Amino acid sequence: MEKAFDQYEVWFVTGAQLLYGGDAVIAVDAHSNEMVNGLNESGKLPVKVVYKGTANSSKEVEAVFKAANNDEKCIGVITWMHTFSPAKMWIHGLQQLKKPLLHLHTQFNKEIPWDTMDMDFMNLNQSAHGDREFGHICTRMRIRRKVVVGYWKDEDTQHKIAVWMRVCAGWADSQDMLIIRFGDQMNNVAVTDGDKVEAEQRMGYHVDYCPASELMKYHKNIKDTDVEALVATYFNEYDHDASLEDKSTEAYQKVWNAAKAELALRAILKAKGAKGFTTNFDDLGQTDGSYFDQIPGLASQRLMAEGYGFGAEGDWKSAALYRTVWVMNQGLSKGCSFLEDYTLNFDGANSAILQSHMLEVCPLIAASKPRLEVHFLGIGIRKSQTARLVFTSKVGSGCTATVVDLGNRFRLIVNDVECIESKPLPKLPVASALWIPMPNFEVGAGAWILAGGTHHSCFSYDLTAEYWEDYAEIAGIEMIRIDKDTTISNFKKELRMNEVYYMLNKALC
């Protein structure tokens, strides 16, 4: 088991009925226990599975689902029908269930015992029958769920369950997520705006405004000794020129000020219980010497690495989404980051998009140890020498995602990408990645634009489109995927069909 999710558990509920007698009930319970123990011992699942018994009646189903709703440790429910389990007995429980649902279509035994199977065996082991009945009632009731089909001991089956578990963890985390905005969105920018009320209804997280002046109160109270200790941590953790440690230089003072800004941000985030934040480079408080003298880019980079959601220019949707990406990514090795489409490189089949930001790119995606540097930044209200971590990203496949508000719904846009090696950028000392959107630059970028995608996105080497499909299913939002098989013609058709579906779906639900 992975320690990252020790605070959570997923409940396993088996469906059966009393028609087949007491011996069958005992066998179902024994098989279910063995399966749950086997899943937990496989080492493939990031969240502990807890067997909650066999449901043989409507009252039992309703009781266990209500209990799941009220248990903070429970982040999802797996159901499996060992025998035939008449689906009417699941109606009231499914009406109550608020936690994510996975329907596992499997069987205790892997193969049919051809020479010995009798009617008793067939009655006991009829998931092929029971799971279809359960699937029907879920579909009739418009219950959103993930269906996993496969033998429970197979790695592919366990992987699909593990993906869903990670998404459930991200979803559970977002249900008490607070994002605070220091300042507002960047003026006149459309895509970073949206309906915060609908976002909280759909995705759980809450967004509050926080004036930069409140952050400055925390900034004033930071002790110099704490700042000096953090500066020493910087020098220990990151490559840097030895001259940067010269306390008589402006560069050292900028690093010192960046450390003070980080401590202030940490203090206010902790005090408010926030899991993410946004900044606006045009709103950083007063400008005298006791206040921020630079964009808190270094602080944002380090806080992202520790799991705080971040969105630039007031982009609260990206801040919340990055936090969810980071949670789902826990225990996986390659890293994730907030990124922005910046500059295009037309190079035939290798045409690519440079991903960067002014400063705020997470070091979890760095190909090698980040380098601490200080350079002039001429953007925003603080045009000054500014500390930052400089690096390039790893080479490899990944997936980037964004959420946009289309007025009548949220759309999750997902694009498979391939990070490639970047050429040196001696005049651009920032963190960056260079990627080719799938299936190629022309189609990938074109589809993203047609879908209304943002210039900000949340990227991971470890998460795949399957994670995002599960997330969209749980949230009840639209998902559009751009991958190796995408064509512009078919993509346009999908967008048009989805437009009609979501307009009609509001009337059906």
From Swiss-Prot:
InterPro entries: Ara_Isoase_C (IPR024664), AraA_central (IPR055390), AraA_N (IPR055389), AraA_N_sf (IPR038583), Fuc/Ara_isomerase_C (IPR004216), Fucose_isomerase_N/cen_sf (IPR009015), Lara_isomerase (IPR003762). GO terms for molecular function: L-arabinose isomerase activity; manganese ion binding. GO terms for cellular component: cytosol. GO terms for biological process: L-arabinose catabolic process to xylulose 5-phosphate. Pfam families: AraA_central, AraA_N, Arabinose_Iso_C. Binds 1 Mn(2+) ion per subunit. It is an enzyme of class 5 (isomerase). Its EC number is 5.3.1.4. Pathway: Carbohydrate degradation; L-arabinose degradation via L-ribulose; D-xylulose 5-phosphate from L-arabinose (bacterial route): step 1/3. Its cofactor is Mn(2+). Mn(2+) binds at residues 313, 340, 357, 456. It catalyses: beta-L-arabinopyranose = L-ribulose. It comes from the Bacteria. PANTHER family: L-ARABINOSE ISOMERASE. Belongs to the arabinose isomerase family. Catalyzes the conversion of L-arabinose to L-ribulose. HAMAP family: Arabinose_Isome. This is L-arabinose isomerase. It comes from Phocaeicola vulgatus (strain ATCC 8482 / DSM 1447 / JCM 5826 / CCUG 4940 / NBRC 14291 / NCTC 11154). The gene is araA.
